[in-house]
């Protein structure tokens, strides 16, 4: 069982293609993380792998390195201009993040990547794909759309990557995954890599069906919540929740913070109070347009925003560095979501703080969460008289370009007027 951030395995000791090796060196990577140290010696030999690893463990670089190495080792000219590698991820944000992480390898090797995800950018994505690509990174729905239209053929695929496989199961994408894998060459004629936070029975079944005798690699922390994360729990009344949150933000003064709530409406309420109080805060929910979502994530990463209020859409798969604090304004209904939420902090060897509210509505979720993580969350008390009393009048969300539902409604109205 590995529990350190880096292993003793050096990238320079791996039999990587020289262009990939040089890119890794220039990027400043010297030692592998545990998942990289265990998976790369297998995948560089062309063997399939099913790896268990949480986000933030370096698995993206593990499969990107292997993918670029494999395509370069084949050393065949892509005259078809069709993709030779297919990387599937559950969300468009993760697709974009993987593409960003691959940029240094793209620049060093000359291999070309294309994106395929829903929400926006259809024409832009098509333009890139039409020019010929080596690696397609996408969500299942948009990739299937391109395949059925004949825009993309998967006959030339040499590498397949399934990232966050368990999450794709949770979102109901398994039929889409199987459809795409059947369009690819048979498992014996390609390298397939699967990564998942858990290697559950259903994930292993998928590996058995569509992989060629995969090697199983598991990197599991000593405790599910990570030993670098300081957890804290409060029992506020529903009436005190907002005042307690704003008081703690004033006391903790987090450098970069994510506040999770279970519903879009509650997220908007939290955003309204914090925005009115002068905090640099962004709102990330399922209704936010893709362009706006990417802009928010960039502002948060760049430090233009200090706080991000989000539903679980941002809890998994996104690489957001240097998050110092995570607040569970609502305890999640799903135990795994608790782990993935607080896993936004304490990444890459850094420490982090997680503060959760077990309120009247969601305290019922606490026993199952503590059983799942294997320990009780330390409880802290608060003095209701010491909480901030004069809460500001919350700002209201301005509907418009901000949310996709409003855009759809406006489009329908225009069509009705036209016809």
From Swiss-Prot:
A motif (Q motif) lies at residues 9-37. The gene is rhlB. Residues 241-388 form the Helicase C-terminal domain. Component of the RNA degradosome, which is a multiprotein complex involved in RNA processing and mRNA degradation. Its main location: cytoplasm. Its EC number is 3.6.4.13. InterPro entries: DEAD/DEAH_box_helicase_dom, DEAD_box_RNA_helicase, Helicase_ATP-bd, Helicase_C-like, P-loop_NTPase, RNA-helicase_DEAD-box_CS, RNA_helicase_ATP-dep_RhlB, RNA_helicase_DEAD_Q_motif. It is found in: Cytoplasm. PANTHER family: ATP-DEPENDENT RNA HELICASE RHLB, ATP-DEPENDENT RNA HELICASE RHLE-RELATED. A motif (DEAD box) lies at residues 163-166. Keywords: ATP-binding, Cytoplasm, Helicase, Hydrolase, Nucleotide-binding, RNA-binding. GO terms for cellular component: cytosol. Residues 40-217 form the Helicase ATP-binding domain. GO terms for molecular function: ATP binding; ATP hydrolysis activity; RNA binding; RNA helicase activity. Belongs to the DEAD box helicase family. RhlB subfamily. It catalyses: ATP + H2O = ADP + phosphate + H(+). It comes from the Bacteria. This is ATP-dependent RNA helicase RhlB. It holds the Pfam family DEAD. ATP binds at residues 53-60. The keyword ATP-binding applies. DEAD-box RNA helicase involved in RNA degradation. Has RNA-dependent ATPase activity and unwinds double-stranded RNA. GO terms for biological process: RNA catabolic process.
């Amino acid at each position: 069982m590995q529990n350190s951030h880096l292993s003793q395995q050096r990238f320079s000791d791996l039999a990587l293609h020289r262009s990939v090796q040089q890119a890794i060196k220039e990027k400043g990577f010297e030692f592998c993380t545990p998942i990289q140290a265990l998976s790369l010696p297998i995948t560089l030999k062309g063997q399939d792998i099913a790896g268990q690893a949480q986000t933030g463990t370096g698995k993206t670089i593990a499969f990107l390195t292997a993918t670029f190495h494999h395509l370069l080792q084949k050393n065949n000219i892509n005259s078809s201009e069709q993709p030779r590698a297919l990387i599937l991820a559950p969300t468009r944000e993760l697709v974009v993040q993987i593409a960003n992480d691959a940029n240094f390898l793209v620049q060093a090797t000359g291999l070309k990547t294309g994106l395929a995800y829903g929400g926006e950018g259809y024409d832009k994505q098509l333009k890139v794909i039409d020019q010929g690509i080596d690696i397609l990174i996408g969500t299942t729905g948009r990739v299937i759309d391109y395949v059925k239209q004949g825009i993309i053929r998967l006959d030339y695929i040499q590498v397949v990557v399934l990232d966050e496989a368990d999450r794709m199961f949770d979102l109901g994408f398994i039929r889409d995954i199987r459809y795409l894998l059947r369009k690819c060459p048979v498992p014996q004629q390609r390298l397939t890599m699967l990564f998942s936070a858990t290697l559950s029975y259903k994930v292993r079944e998928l590996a058995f069906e569509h992989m060629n005798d995969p090697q199983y690699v598991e990197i599991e922390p000593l405790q599910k919540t990570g030993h670098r994360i300081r957890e804290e729990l409060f029992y506020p009344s529903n009436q005190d929740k907002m005042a307690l949150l704003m008081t703690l933000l004033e006391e903790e003064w987090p450098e970069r913070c994510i506040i999770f709530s279970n519903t879009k409406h509650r997220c908007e309420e939290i955003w309204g109070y914090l925005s009115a109080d002068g905090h640099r805060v962004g709102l990330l929910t399922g209704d936010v347009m893709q362009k706006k979502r990417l802009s928010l994530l960039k502002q948060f990463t760049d430090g233009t925003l200090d706080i991000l209020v989000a539903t679980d859409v941002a809890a998994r798969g996104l690489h957001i560095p240097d998050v110092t604090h995570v607040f569970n304004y609502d305890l999640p209904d799903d135990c795994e979501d608790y782990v993935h939420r607080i896993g936004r902090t304490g990444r890459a060897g850094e420490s982090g703080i997680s503060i959760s509210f077990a309120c009247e509505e969601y305290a019922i979720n606490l026993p199952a969460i503590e059983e799942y993580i294997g320990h009780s969350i330390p409880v802290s008390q608060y003095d209701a008289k010491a909480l901030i009393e004069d809460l500001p009048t919350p700002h209201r969300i301005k509907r418009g370009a901000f949310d996709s539902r409003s855009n759809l409604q406006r489009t329908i109205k225009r069509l009705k007027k036209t016809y």
